[in-house]
């Protein structure tokens, strides 16, 4: 099954990261092209005027697929040259497709958004979070260099100092701190998040 599901409700596209048994981890073979295909379908449908991105199950996205990293498979397989290609053809395709989406994109962060998952959320124009959500860019804790574009984007969202603090410490922050820092716009109870995201999407689509 595709990593990204697409549902259309009138002028709104709902895109759902769909690997709930792995907290929507990303980086398996084919994830990049799958996300690109969904984004292309959204752009091709001129009746779609806004999109909402969320995660299936209890997480938005736990980030890169650590199991695939350990097994050296998917985007993380092979020799260093191959890993570079895996990032270019898989991970980078995911973030570029979302960042370059031609309609406004809202991230409805329904749970943990960690590492690549946090950076994927940041590709949206607007970020809303459930009150229990956690966000962090924890690459250094895994001995990784942030390589998905988030290190470029994060300082532009929350400022250089706070971005450096998150990147250098690997700290995970709660939704209230994320709102205080400007990483998310609004916080809602978990059972209200998607409803509020849809209300906002409908307002945007109506402009």
Residues covered by each model-derived region:
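Hydrophobic, secondary-structure "cap" segments at the distal end of domains
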Residues: 152-161
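C-terminal long alpha-helix characteristic of the crotonase
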Residues: 128-133, 161, 175, 184-207
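Glycine-rich beta-to-alpha active-site loop
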Residues: 58, 92-142, 146
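Acidic, divalent-metal-coordinating active-site segment for phosphoryl/phosphodiester hydrolysis
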Residues: 115, 171-177
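Hydrophobic/aromatic residues within transmembrane alpha-helices
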Residues: 15, 53, 65, 120-121, ...
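Charged catalytic carboxylate motif
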Residues: 30-34, 90, 97, 196
């Amino acid at each position: 099954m595709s990593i990204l599901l697409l549902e259309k409700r009138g002028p709104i596209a709902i895109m759902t990261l769909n690997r709930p048994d792995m907290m929507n981890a990303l980086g398996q073979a084919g994830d990049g092209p799958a996300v690109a295909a969904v984004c292309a379908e959204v752009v091709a449908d001129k009746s779609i005027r806004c999109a909402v991105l969320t995660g299936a199950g209890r997480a938005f996205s736990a980030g890169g697929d650590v199991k695939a990293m350990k097994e050296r498979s998917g985007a993380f397989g092979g020799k260093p040259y191959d890993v570079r290609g895996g990032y270019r053809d898989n991970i980078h395709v995911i973030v570029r497709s979302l960042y370059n989406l031609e309609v406004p994109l809202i991230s409805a962060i329904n749970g943990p958004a960690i590492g690549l998952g946090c950076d994927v959320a940041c590709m949206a124009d607007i970020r809303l979070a459930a009150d229990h959500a956690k966000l962090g860019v924890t690459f250094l804790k895994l001995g990784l260099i942030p390589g998905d574009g988030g290190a470029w984007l994060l300082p532009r969202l929350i400022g250089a100092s706070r971005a450096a603090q998150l990147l250098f410490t690997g700290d995970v922050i709660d939704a209230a701190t994320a709102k205080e820092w400007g990483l998310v716009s609004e916080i809602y109870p978990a059972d209200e998040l998607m409803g509020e995201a849809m209300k906002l999407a409908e307002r945007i689509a109506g402009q």
